[in-house]
């Protein structure tokens, strides 16, 4: 969801020559990165109601599907991924952008890249149509390490990290696990399932935490793990089957996930939580965005509809 509190800002001249697939504000809301089928990434400086194109990044050999900013504690770093199966890491230093790392081991389109919460380290998860997920890690000695593993045989469409802090840990007397011990994320695939993965230090890879979450009857297009760290864990999943499923887990039994289903009249593409984790935005092929909140009875209500 946008980090701007009020109003919508429209960039009428994006500079792109083809369809735009992603547009993401940085942590401070001062820079906007966009990517397109024209194979480029563009960086805009945002100042109040005005914006200025400052850089065009080139290097991908096909459509660029996704861009994602790292946390500013790691510098001005941007990841991009595209149809060419490549993941690029870009860095801006003293006003100049450069490509500091290329990852090209995926055998098909890389659909989504997602940075982990900064407390867990400088980690980037990448979801690919080749059925695998890779996790890139920037090490203290300025080198990059990676793991890559099969996730969904028919292709991986989405990935979302869990909060670095476990639910309930900030309100309980005993401390939560160390940040690196909570390296967990959820993936959504073309096999209609969600899978939750946890880092295993003994093997230096990620293993499925439990059996897949099932119920969708078509591709899972997006997953979003709520950033809230209060009483429960929440995961939202959006599917081409016209439903959003909201999965909840209690800290007392973290491997058990309950599900509530929201029904829509169209295929769904994206789900996104607010920064506080209590509002869910849903968008699909009907060109609407709906906002949902959980009421005191535990039911989900649509509180706003935004139409183009």
From Swiss-Prot:
Q: What is this protein called?
A: Protein transport protein SEC13
Query: What role does this protein play?
Result: Component of the coat protein complex II (COPII) which promotes the formation of transport vesicles from the endoplasmic reticulum (ER). The coat has two main functions, the physical deformation of the endoplasmic reticulum membrane into vesicles and the selection of cargo molecules. It also functions as a component of the nuclear pore complex (NPC). NPC components, collectively referred to as nucleoporins (NUPs), can play the role of both NPC structural components and of docking or interaction partners for transiently associated nuclear transport factors.
Cellular component, GO, one term: nuclear pore outer ring
Which keywords belong to this entry? mRNA transport, Nuclear pore complex, Nucleus, Protein transport, Repeat, Translocation, Transport, WD repeat
User: Can you tell me which family this protein belongs to?
Assistant: Belongs to the WD repeat SEC13 family.
Q: Which organism is it from?
A: Chaetomium thermophilum (strain DSM 1495 / CBS 144.50 / IMI 039719)
Q: Which InterPro entries match?
A: G-protein_beta_WD-40_rep, Sec13/Seh1_fam, WD40/YVTN_repeat-like_dom_sf, WD40_repeat_dom_sf, WD40_rpt
Q: What PROSITE patterns does the record tag this protein with?
A: WD_REPEATS_2, WD_REPEATS_REGION
Task: Name its GO BP terms in alphabetical order.
Answer: COPII-coated vesicle budding; mRNA transport; positive regulation of TOR signaling; protein exit from endoplasmic reticulum; protein import into nucleus
- SUPFAM superfamilies in the record: WD40 repeat-like
| WD repeat locations | 15-54, 59-100, 105-146, 151-207, 215-257, 263-302
Q: Does the keyword Cell division apply?
A: no
Q: How does it assemble?
A: The COPII coat is composed of at least 5 proteins: the SEC23/24 complex, the SEC13/31 complex, and the protein SAR1. Component of the nuclear pore complex (NPC). NPC constitutes the exclusive means of nucleocytoplasmic transport. NPCs allow the passive diffusion of ions and small molecules and the active, nuclear transport receptor-mediated bidirectional transport of macromolecules such as proteins, RNAs, ribonucleoparticles (RNPs), and ribosomal subunits across the nuclear envelope. Due to its 8-fold rotational symmetry, all subunits are present with 8 copies or multiples thereof.
Task: Show the Pfam families listed in the entry.
Answer: WD40
**What is the primary gene name for this protein?**
SEC13
Predominant localisation class: nucleus
- A GO MF label: structural molecule activity
Q: Where found in the cell?
A: Nucleus, Nuclear pore complex
Asked if the record carries the keyword Transport, the reply is yes
